[in-house]
Regions:
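Short membrane-interface loop/juxtamembrane segments of multi-pass integral membrane proteins
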Residues: 39-52, 121-142
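Membrane-interface helix-boundary motifs at transmembrane edges
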Residues: 46-52, 77-84
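Juxtamembrane boundary at the C-terminal end of a transmembrane helix
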Residues: 158-171
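C-terminal halves and exits of single transmembrane alpha-helices
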Residues: 89-107, 132-147
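Cytosolic-side membrane-entry/anchor segment at the start of a transmembrane helix
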Residues: 23-66
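Core segments of transmembrane alpha-helices
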Residues: 56-75, 141-157
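Alpha-helical transmembrane segments
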Residues: 2-21, 85-101
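Juxtamembrane non-transmembrane "cap" segments at the membrane-aqueous interface
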Residues: 105-128
């Protein structure tokens, strides 16, 4: 396992994920509405439409996760890492880096500090769920300390390792 490449690829993946997500949310916060805390979604005068939900999931799957899975698998294989478990460990480390950069860059710095007013969904202004403590306690920390490390990262790491093995077989 190439540790330097793993860390650098993790930062590259985190940069792509966070910059793309941040730009989309800054452009039009409603596009990210399905990933807002449930209390804010329920309080909205206009809840997310089917088209918005569909766009969000297509964008997350094909605009965010799939390119990162491909990049992670190809880069790891090109770095000389082979075998399912080394590939999965590399993928897990990279996805955890994406996770923690998402927590610190998007949830903590950008949404709660730097550009808070730009992330407010029209019709939910003044909702207590946008407060720092509520956002972190009810949404960001459970997502980034429970959901990502124990569900998302293992699934994405296994998918990335499997993709790496397929690349090794057919490339």
């Amino acid at each position: 396992m190439n540790w330097t490449r793993t860390v650098l690829d993790g930062f590259a993946m985190a940069a792509y994920f966070n910059l793309f997500a941040g730009l989309v949310a800054l452009y039009k916060p409603r596009l990210m509405f399905p990933c807002y805390p449930p209390a804010i979604i329920k309080a909205a005068k206009d809840p997310p439409t089917g088209v918005e939900n569909r766009f969000y999931w297509l964008w997350i799957c094909f605009g965010e996760l799939l390119p990162l899975l491909l990049y992670g698998a190809v880069s790891t294989m090109e770095g000389g890492t082979t075998g399912f478990w080394p590939l999965a460990l590399t993928g897990y480390i990279q996805w955890m880096m994406v996770n923690f950069c998402d927590l610190f860059f998007l949830d903590f710095w950008l949404i709660q500090r730097k550009a808070k007013s730009r992330f407010i969904i029209p019709g939910t202004e003044g909702h207590p769920g946008y407060g720092f403590n509520a956002w972190m306690k009810d949404y960001a920390l459970p997502e980034h300390l429970l959901q990502w490390p124990f569900l998302m990262c293992p699934i994405l790491a296994a998918a990335q390792a499997g993709l790496g093995l397929l690349i090794d077989i057919f490339w």
